[in-house]
Design a protein with these regions (language model features):
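Ubiquitin-like/PB1-type beta-grasp interaction modules and other compact soluble beta-rich domains
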Residues: 1-74
Length: 75
């Protein structure tokens, strides 16, 4: 099983889900998962997979832990 954790505004976009556990015995594209959750790709700013930065087109595999953060802005 893989764990996907959403942060800040991404939680609301995903219907209030903060953490998901998915069966990833077959690798799944992060973009596919985001589409299923209703989270637009362009809203995801930082992706951390297994404690390392990753890209939006990464493959989620069994035992992965993925943290998703929205685009942050400020001044």
């Amino acid at each position: 099983m893989a764990v996907v954790r959403l942060h800040l505004t991404l939680i609301e976009m995903a219907g209030g889900r903060k953490e998901l556990t998915i069966d990833a015995q077959q690798p799944v594209l992060l973009t596919t998962l985001l589409a299923q959750l209703g989270v637009p790709e362009e809203e995801v700013g930082i992706i951390v997979r297994n404690r390392k930065r990753d890209e939006i087109d990464c493959m989620i595999q069994d035992e992965d832990v993925v943290e998703l953060f929205p685009i942050l802005s400020g001044g």
